[in-house]
Design a protein with these regions (language model features):
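Conserved RNP beta-strands of RNA recognition motif
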Residues: 62
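Short S/T/G/P-rich N-terminal loop/turn motif that feeds into the first structured element of a domain
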Residues: 1-43, 47-58, 67-70, 93-105
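An amphipathic, aromatic/His-enriched active-site/gating alpha helix that lines ligand/cofactor pockets
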Residues: 65-98
Length: 105
């Protein structure tokens, strides 16, 4: 990953079984429309690196790279009314171990 491509974030979204998007036509439509906006997000500098669903936990893990935090928030905005989310800035383990290299200290 190139730093000029932006920071990397892991977005963690969850919901209760009762408000699971898979339980209603409206919820499924919302989730499908959200996911279909990936191309628009890419045009705004939000690159999806990976995305996983833990279906039995009602949880999504979406790793993104973004230059603009506001564009990142706009991408995830459709989830906010029915999901609980957290967006964590992260670095790779390789980058981190270089940073804490005891030979540098």
């Amino acid at each position: 990953m190139n730093d000029s491509d932006g920071m990397v974030f892991v977005a963690h979204w969850t919901h209760t079984p009762e408000n699971c998007p898979g339980r209603s036509k409206e919820g499924a439509t919302m989730l499908n429309e959200f996911w279909a906006r990936r191309d628009l997000a890419a045009k705004k500098g939000v690159k999806i690196l990976s995305a996983y669903v833990a279906a039995t936990e009602h949880t999504y893990y979406i790793t993104v790279q973004a230059k603009d935090y506001q564009a990142l928030l706009e991408f995830f905005e459709p989830l906010a009314p029915t999901q609980t989310g957290a967006i964590h800035p992260v670095t790779t383990m390789d980058e981190w171990t270089k940073h804490i290299d005891p030979k540098r200290k």
